[in-house]
C-alpha cells in the first residue's frame, strides 16, 4: 500500500470543528492511477499537499510508502518528498530564465538517492523521450511553447525516479491537442516506470486514463 490515511483532519486555523479535510480512511495501492475530482475549494489541492508533505495534518495519520509523514518535521518531509515523490504543478513552477536541463537540475540536487552522473543520464533520457531536442534543452524555458514547458515539468517531476507521481490540475492551461499529447506522454511514462499516480482535475474527459475515479467527498467529510 503506497498511501494510507486514517482518522486525519486538517484545518488552516487549527480549529478541527472547521476542518477543511476530514478523512476516516483512504488507501491507495501500489501502481494505482487515481483521479480525484470535486468543486473548487473542496480541498483537492490540500489533499495532494498533505500526501506530499508540503502540509502537515492537524490530527491523525498519513503514511506514504510506509513512512509516517505526520511524525516527521518539515525538513524531514522535504527530504522524503525529494527522494520518493514527483509533483507536477498546475502553473508548472519552472524558473523562466533557466534552461530545461537547469530546471531539472534543481529537483535533482535535492535528492540524496542517486549520484549526479546517473541522474544526468536519466534527465537526458527523459527529455529525449518527451520529444525535446538538445537545442531546446539549452533554451530558457520562457522561450519554449506551453506544451514544451509542460514536458519539462514532467521531466523535472520524474528525474529522481519517484515511486509516486502527484499531479495538480496539470492540463488546465492546455488546449485540447496539447492536453491529449500530455496525457499520452504522462501515462506512457507512468506505466513504463510502474509508478503510482495521484491526479486531481476538473476535466472529467480524462477519466478514461485512470484505474480509479473518485469524488473527494466520497472519502472526506467536508462542510
Residues of each region from the PLM?
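Helix-to-loop junction immediately C-terminal to a conserved catalytic motif
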Residues: 52
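Conserved ABC ATPase "signature" region
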Residues: 68, 117-135
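Conserved ABC transporter NBD signature motif
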Residues: 60-68
Amino acid at each position: 500500500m503506497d498511501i494510507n490515511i486514517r482518522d486525519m483532519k486538517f484545518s488552516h486555523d487549527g480549529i478541527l470543528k472547521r476542518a477543511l479535510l476530514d478523512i476516516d480512511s483512504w488507501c491507495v495501492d501500489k501502481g494505482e492511477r487515481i483521479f480525484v475530482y470535486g468543486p473548487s475549494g473542496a480541498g483537492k489541492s490540500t489533499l495532494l499537499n498533505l500526501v506530499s508533505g508540503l502540509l502537515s495534518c492537524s490530527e491523525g495519520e498519513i503514511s506514504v510508502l510506509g513512512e509516517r509523514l505526520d511524525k516527521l518535521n518539515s525538513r524531514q518531509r522535504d527530504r522524503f518528498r525529494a527522494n520518493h515523490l514527483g509533483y507536477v504543478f498546475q502553473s508548472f513552477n519552472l524558473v523562466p530564465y533557466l534552461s530545461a536541463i537547469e530546471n531539472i537540475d534543481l529537483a535533482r540536487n535535492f535528492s540524496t538517492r542517486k549520484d549526479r552522473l546517473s541522474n544526468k543520464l536519466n534527465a537526458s533520457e527523459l527529455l529525449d523521450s518527451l520529444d525535446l531536442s538538445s537545442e531546446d534543452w539549452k533554451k530558457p524555458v520562457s522561450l519554449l511553447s506551453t506544451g514544451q514547458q509542460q514536458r519539462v515539468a514532467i521531466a523535472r517531476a520524474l528525474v529522481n525516479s519517484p515511486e509516486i507521481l502527484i499531479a495538480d490540475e496539470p492540463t488546465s492551461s492546455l488546449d485540447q491537442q496539447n492536453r491529449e499529447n500530455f496525457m499520452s506522454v504522462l501515462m506512457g511514462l507512468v506505466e513504463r516506470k510502474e509508478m503510482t499516480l495521484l491526479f486531481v482535475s476538473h476535466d472529467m474527459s480524462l477519466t478514461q486514463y485512470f484505474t480509479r475515479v473518485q469524488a473527494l467527498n466520497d472519502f472526506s467529510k467536508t462542510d
